[in-house]
């Protein structure tokens, strides 16, 4: 055996003498060719394996010591072999540092000379500037381990050898297994070196979409200042959207991709190191950097995009120096004696004799200035711009078959936004050609595309058209959190307010006065209630833009779609005293009850009209003749006052109607013959009686058809409630129709009562609703069955109500309703729907002076006729009661004659029969109740509504200004019960009002506070304003009003959403999807210095053997004066989530105070979770579930959750066509100034404009304001379970801490980049690392920019499919339907985009 005993290098640990076998004692020829690295590697492997073969000893300690030393040296030698063959080594300056493990910390100082430009002119001469930069070394390490079993250890040390061939074979197997383990360890170090350096470069590589505009702005000097930052951020957003996944985009051709790659490789800074150990092509041109990416991207780049200029590269085969200054002095002094090249490795570590090291053609130059050895390897060198780039992909070479994910394959989370249910402005509802999408044959409802949209269609990841509809929002709206406003009210009460107008916000008891005096007293003292114009009046006259502008002082009170927040006298229980107490102002909240009370700018007249048109298209419509006749009647200022008197005499009594039937027939016929108008249409009882008794031939057919049509339409309106209510069992004795619609609710009275039927049914339907009822200034009421002449007291006050005389004598002794409950329901529909549809607000409820009514109605002149005389045929006959001879002043004959109404003597005689069933006064009724069981929670249980009604009152149509009897208030006086019946013209009947009072009364509907107030009324100003400004006819308005009276409660909304009725609330749909992306990393040449320490081997006992652990300390330091590396997502692989329509259900994720009635709460929880794909199979805990339930199988990927943010239907649709904040207002530090409060002000101070849309404060006041409905729903500050990143994609947009954290990351990065070229003190430390949070720019840009991206969607499939077919000039609008184009980073990347 020949021995080799060469002394080790001075900087290497001593190596024990070892013996090599003859075949391996001389290294193979090492030449500066492509075989150099592989030859070194093969020689090292053979030396190591030869050691295993020739080792023989029975001393375990000797074995262990020599093996540890040789193993460490072996791995230290070859750990860089693979690394030097990769393109990553272009970005590194590798330095061997044996003493690295003893270094506690290390810093390196660089001197940088700033370039100058000599200039002419009077400029002062510039002086050379030298900048000193101090950088800190980052300590790292690599570790690996393996175990040698005790049996193998015995075989290796020959302790267990027995001299047989089997034992020899087993020993050889043990040696081979150990060699495999060692090879695996070496392989892990080789792969680990690549992985570690790749991650080091990624740590210092800001995303290219960010760095490209930053470098451009820096070059132009546009970094400092808030304005410049805003411009920069705007460019950043555009870059992220347009240049992410550039290689997928259908509109990106070869030139576009090359242009982007050129910007990418030019946005980094060159390093301060100019090493001679660097890479070059085969012709000697230096490589400028390395572009590391995935195999897929590499193949695509090489397939016609980039041109390969060379297929081989010369790489250094040496440990390099960090700073070159003629010699290796710095490295030698700081790190010990340098190992410059592989010759030193062969000499010092492998113990190969110098004579046998290399058969070279070049002379070996000794000394510190030796020319570095290079080797030629296969490579793909491409030119990008003017740079030579090493194109590298290590996905298969290094990471394949390992359990480590390739760092350049990452995920990207994108949040998408879709508007659902929004109704466009009138100017945007157009069609380029009405026949583009025409309704099919047989469609008798017209083009349904003119109606408000209820669905949004889009594509999932597998190109299937799916949709979301309004019913999918059940899990959000139909939850008890919809009623939780305690925190909102508490926050509002922290402010300071002035109580300048209490009208509409204050309710009193009716005073103990006659109603005429009480109403007049209010009119005269209106100044105490109406010092300034009421807020609720001003809001109704605002446009959408005005309402959402910063100039709207009331915007801060619009926080919830179902609640009004308003200023009230503090600590005053309602109904309060007649004189408003002088107390501090406070804030109160009231339930809006029904969706028609949403402020008109947020649920505009156009939408309500369209909803009415949609319902009218499939239900009964009144004929044009009916509409013309009734509309003309309601606007007839010459409508006979005698008809009002007859109506008062009948006062809703079916018995009296039967007595006066002849008179009624003649009045109707005469009025119809005179002007083709219909009488008594202001009174439901009269219309119903006429339809029942007089439509069988007694009247002209055309006239009869009007009354029939009216009643038919009333019943059709009633069927709307039935059609849009899910049929199910009653709750707590209340039908679901009653819980769904206000007019079916028994606690709501008609505005005019002619008997006590509504009060009887109200008492039956109260349940736990805490009824408040004040009649004639006294609590509750007493009943008088009927009144005869001798018992009448027309000045009576108090709470006694007359129930009217029943028709059947058997019912005279019992207090029972005259009609079924449905009669009362139809009565409410007639007054609250039909009358406003025709009157358009030009009517008023009136009190009746029955003493004058009866005096006039009984003042009838009837000539005597002999029994054998023929009755007179007309007024020309002197015997006719309307002949001029019989027209005595102040008689009823005169009133009929003046109105050209022809009646005979027999008809007039019937008036005398009414004295046995009289009315004596009009009584004011103030009633109130707490919410029904569908909307009763801990927050709303004490919220009352207060409404007014008149018992034995009358509805006067257009004010008969030419009739002096009415103008003088002889028979009637105005008592408005709510805004629908409060026409100012009728105040002329109140004589001698002060001029100032009359002026003030015109500012708002003059509803006395003892009959309710706007904010406490069931029917508020928005619905009254709507009927005045609607452009539709009575058919459409009636259906729109009927749709507006559906309740805003969780149970009511469940019925509406489930059956497809638009609730007057739109939604912003938010969905977050995850995508798999291929990244590209570019690093400048020699941008990082990489230090490698000595591998240390430790062993410790292990179960059944010995474990060897190898650890190599390493360190790195950045060599740049700026960012020397950048990365970007180049290719979108696929979507991990399904991009689907799985909807959120708050019942599954959110604990919230339940409804007060357990039966209602259980019903709501049951029906809203039914059919949910993520619904649990067991009872949901009170605080929600920890994790959502998963389905048994998945087809399209992980389910992405859609969440719904309630949004006004009149919200600007253009807002959703570009990236926007789902809250409706921009947020984040990137928009704010330098003050500490600026971030909070940007989010919540709506006196400042939205930074993204300065002309308005917000696009959604229900989400953007502090403690608004959506803010409380999704802000993590208020919710611990539901609003969390685990469940909610909206969490990051609503939680202030999350918003501040994410956006400050971008602000910090901009600040650091802006100061990259500033001078640094010698004692400072600068490390250009990827700032914390900049990863979000590629992985979650939406949280960084606080914006969600519009995705391709449309409310009509035809629009969506026409766009998807790729035809040119696709429309974005067709009538009320709209299409949203994809404005996200994945736009054009997937087939659907």
Swiss-Prot record:
Keywords: Capsid protein, Host nucleus, T=16 icosahedral capsid protein, Virion. One of its GO terms (cellular component) is T=16 icosahedral viral capsid. Pfam families: Herpes_MCP. It is found in: Virion; Host nucleus. GO terms for molecular function: structural molecule activity. Its main location: virion. Belongs to the herpesviridae major capsid protein family. Self-assembles to form an icosahedral capsid with a T=16 symmetry, about 200 nm in diameter, and consisting of 150 hexons and 12 pentons (total of 162 capsomers). Hexons form the edges and faces of the capsid and are each composed of six MCP molecules. In contrast, one penton is found at each of the 12 vertices. Eleven of the pentons are MCP pentamers, while the last vertex is occupied by the portal complex. Homomultimer. Makes the hexons and eleven out of twelve pentons. Interacts with triplex proteins 1/TRX1 and 2/TRX2; adjacent capsomers are linked together in groups of three by triplexes, heterotrimeric complexes composed of one molecule of TRX1 and two molecules of TRX2. Interacts with scaffold protein; this interaction allows efficient MCP transport to the host nucleus. Interacts with capsid vertex component 2/CVC2. Interacts with the small capsomere-interacting protein/SCP. This is Major capsid protein. It comes from Gallid herpesvirus 2 (strain Chicken/Md5/ATCC VR-987). The gene is MCP.
């Amino acid at each position: 055996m020949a021995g080799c005993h060469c002394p080790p290098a001075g900087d290497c640990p001593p190596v024990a003498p070892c013996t090599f076998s003859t075949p391996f004692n001389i290294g193979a020829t090492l030449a500066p060719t492509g075989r150099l690295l592989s030859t070194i590697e093969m020689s090292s492997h053979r030396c190591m394996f030869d050691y295993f073969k020739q080792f023989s000893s029975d001393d375990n300690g000797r074995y262990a010591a020599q093996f540890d030393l040789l193993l460490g040296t072996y791995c230290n030698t070859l750990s860089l072999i693979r690394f030097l063959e990769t393109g990553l080594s272009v970005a590194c300056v590798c330095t061997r540092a044996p003493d690295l493990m003893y270094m506690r910390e290390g810093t390196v100082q660089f001197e940088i000379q700033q370039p100058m430009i000599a200039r002419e002119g009077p400029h002062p001469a510039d002086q050379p500037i030298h900048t000193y930069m101090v950088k800190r070394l980052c300590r790292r390490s690599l570790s690996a381990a393996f175990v040698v079993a005790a049996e193998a250890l015995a075989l290796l040390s020959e302790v267990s050898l027995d001299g047989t061939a089997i034992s020899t074979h087993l020993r050889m197997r043990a040696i081979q297994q150990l060699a495999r383990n060692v090879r695996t360890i070496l392989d892990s170090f080789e792969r680990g070196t690549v992985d570690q350096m790749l991650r080091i470069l990624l740590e210092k590589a800001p995303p290219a979409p960010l760095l490209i505009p930053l470098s451009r702005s820096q070059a132009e000097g546009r970094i400092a200042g808030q304005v410049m930052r805003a411009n920069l951020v705007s460019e950043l957003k555009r870059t992220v959207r347009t240049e992410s996944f550039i290689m997928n985009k259908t509109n990106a051709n070869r030139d576009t991709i090359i242009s982007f790659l050129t910007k990418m490789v030019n946005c980094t800074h060159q390093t301060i190191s100019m090493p001679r150990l660097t890479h070059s092509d085969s012709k000697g041109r230096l490589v400028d950097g390395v572009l590391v990416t995935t195999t897929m991207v590499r193949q695509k780049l090489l397939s016609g995009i980039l041109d390969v200029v060379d297929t081989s590269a010369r790489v250094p085969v040496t440990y390099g120096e960090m700073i070159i200054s003629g010699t290796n002095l710095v490295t030698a002094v700081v790190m010990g004696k340098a190992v410059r090249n592989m010759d030193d490795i062969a000499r010092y570590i492998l113990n190969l004799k110098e004579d046998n090291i290399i058969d070279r053609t070049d002379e070996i130059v000794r000394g510190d200035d030796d020319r570095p050895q290079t080797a030629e390897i296969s490579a793909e060198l491409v030119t990008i711009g003017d740079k030579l780039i090493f194109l590298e992909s290590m996905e298969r070479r290094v990471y394949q078959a390992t359990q480590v994910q390739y760092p350049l394959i990452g995920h990207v989370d994108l949040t998408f936004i879709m508007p659902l249910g929004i109704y466009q402005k009138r100017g945007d509802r157009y069609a380029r050609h009405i026949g583009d999408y025409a309704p099919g044959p047989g469609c008798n409802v017209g083009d349904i595309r003119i109606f408000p949209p209820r669905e949004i269609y889009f594509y999932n990841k597998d190109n299937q058209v799916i949709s979301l509809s309004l019913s999918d929002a059940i899990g959000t709206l139909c939850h008890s959190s919809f009623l939780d406003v305690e925190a909102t009210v508490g926050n509002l009460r922290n402010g300071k307010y002035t109580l300048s107008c209490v009208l509409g916000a204050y309710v009193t008891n009716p005073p103990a006065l006659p109603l005429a005096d009480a109403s007049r007293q209010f009119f005269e003292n209106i100044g105490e209630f109406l010092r300034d114009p009421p807020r609720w009046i001003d809001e109704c006259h605002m446009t959408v833009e005005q309402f959402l502008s910063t100039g709207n002082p009331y915007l801060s009170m619009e926080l919830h779609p179902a609640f009004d927040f308003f200023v009230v006298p503090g600590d005053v229980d309602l109904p309060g005293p007649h004189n408003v107490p002088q107390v501090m102002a406070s804030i109160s909240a009231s339930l809006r009850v029904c969706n028609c009370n949403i402020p008109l700018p947020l649920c505009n007249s156009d939408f309500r009209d369209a909803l009415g048109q949609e319902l009218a298209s499939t239900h009964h419509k009144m004929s044009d003749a009916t509409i013309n006749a009734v509309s003309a009647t309601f606007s007839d200022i010459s409508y006979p006052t005698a008809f009002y008197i007859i109506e008062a005499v009948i006062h809703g009594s079916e018995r009296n109607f039967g007595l006066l039937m002849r008179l009624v027939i003649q009045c109707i016929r005469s009025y119809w013959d005179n002007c083709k108008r219909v009488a008594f249409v202001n009174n439901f009882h009269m219309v119903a009686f006429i339809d029942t008794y007089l439509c069988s031939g007694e009247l002209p057919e055309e006239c009869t058809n009007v009354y029939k049509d009216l009643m038919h339409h009333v019943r059709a309106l009633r069927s709307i409630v039935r059609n849009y209510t899910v049929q199910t069992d009653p709750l707590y004795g209340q039908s679901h129709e009653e819980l769904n619609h206000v007019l079916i609710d028994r606690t709501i009275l008609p505005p005019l009562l002619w008997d006590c039927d509504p009060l009887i049914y109200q008492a039956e339907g109260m349940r736990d609703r805490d009824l408040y009822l004040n009649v004639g200034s006294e609590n509750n009421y007493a009943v008088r069955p009927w009144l005869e002449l001798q018992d009448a007291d027309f000045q009576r006050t108090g709470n006694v109500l007359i129930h009217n005389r029943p028709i059947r004598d058997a019912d005279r002794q019992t207090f029972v309703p005259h009609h079924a409950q449905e009669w009362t329901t139809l009565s409410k529909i007639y007054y609250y729907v039909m009358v406003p549809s025709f009157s358009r607000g030009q009517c008023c409820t009136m009190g009746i002076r029955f003493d004058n009514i009866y005096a006039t109605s009984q003042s009838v002149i009837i000539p005597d006729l002999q029994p054998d005389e023929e009755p007179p045929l007309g007024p020309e006959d002197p015997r006719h009661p309307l002949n001029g001879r019989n027209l005595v002043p102040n008689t009823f004959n005169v009133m009929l004659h003046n109105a050209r109404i022809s009646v005979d003597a027999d008809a007039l005689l019937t008036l005398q029969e009414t004295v046995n069933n009289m009315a004596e006064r009009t009584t004011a009724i103030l009633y109130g109740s707490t919410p029904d069981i569908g909307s009763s929670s801990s927050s709303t249980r004490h919220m009352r509504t207060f409404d007014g009604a008149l018992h034995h009152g009358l509805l006067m149509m257009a004010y008969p200004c030419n009739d002096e009897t009415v103008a003088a208030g002889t028979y009637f006086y105005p008592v408005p019960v709510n805004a629908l019946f409060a026409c100012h013209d009728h105040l002329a009947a109140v004589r001698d009002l002060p001029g100032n009072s009359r002026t003030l009364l015109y500012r708002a509907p003059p509803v006395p506070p003892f009959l309710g107030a706007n904010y406490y009324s069931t029917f508020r100003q928005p619905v009254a304003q709507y009927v005045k400004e609607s452009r539709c006819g009575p058919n459409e308005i009636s259906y729109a009003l009927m749709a507006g009276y559906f309740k805003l409660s969780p149970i009511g909304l469940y019925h509406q959403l489930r059956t497809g009725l638009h609730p007057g609330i739109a939604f912003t749909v938010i969905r977050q999807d995850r995508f798999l992306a291929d990244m590209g990393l570019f690093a400048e040449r020699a941008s990082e210095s990489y230090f490698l320490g000595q591998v240390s081997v430790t062993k410790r006992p292990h179960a059944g053997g010995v474990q060897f652990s190898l650890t190599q300390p390493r360190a790195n330091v950045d060599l740049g004066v700026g960012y020397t590396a950048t990365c970007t997502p180049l290719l979108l692989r696929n979507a991990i989530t399904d991009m689907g329509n799985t909807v959120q259900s708050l019942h599954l994720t959110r604990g919230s105070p339940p409804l007060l009635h357990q039966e209602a709460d259980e019903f709501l929880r049951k029906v809203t979770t039914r059919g949910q794909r993520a619904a649990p199979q067991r009872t949901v805990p009170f605080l929600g579930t920890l994790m959502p339930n998963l389905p048994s199988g998945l087809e399209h990927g992980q389910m992405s959750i859609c969440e719904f943010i309630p949004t006004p239907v009149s919200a600007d649709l253009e807002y959703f066509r570009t990236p926007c904040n789902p809250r409706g207002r921009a947020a984040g530090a990137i928009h704010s100034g330098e003050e500490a409060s600026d971030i909070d002000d940007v989010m919540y101070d709506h006196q400042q404009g939205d930074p993204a849309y300065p002309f308005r404060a917000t696009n959604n006041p229900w989400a953007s304001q502090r403690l608004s409905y959506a803010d409380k729903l999704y802000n993590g500050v208020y919710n611990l379970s539901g609003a969390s990143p685990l469940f909610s994609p909206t969490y990051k947009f609503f939680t202030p801490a999350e918003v501040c954290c994410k956006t400050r990351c971008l602000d910090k990065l901009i600040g650091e980049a802006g100061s990259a070229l500033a001078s640094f003190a010698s004692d400072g430390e600068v490390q250009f690392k990827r700032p914390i949070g900049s990863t979000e720019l590629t992985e979650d840009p939406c949280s960084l920019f606080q914006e969600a991206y519009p995705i391709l969607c449309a409310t009509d499939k035809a629009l969506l499919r026409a766009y998807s077919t790729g035809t040119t000039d696709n429309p974005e609008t067709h009538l009320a339907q709209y299409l949203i184009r994809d404005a996200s980073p994945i736009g054009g990347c997937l087939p659907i985009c």
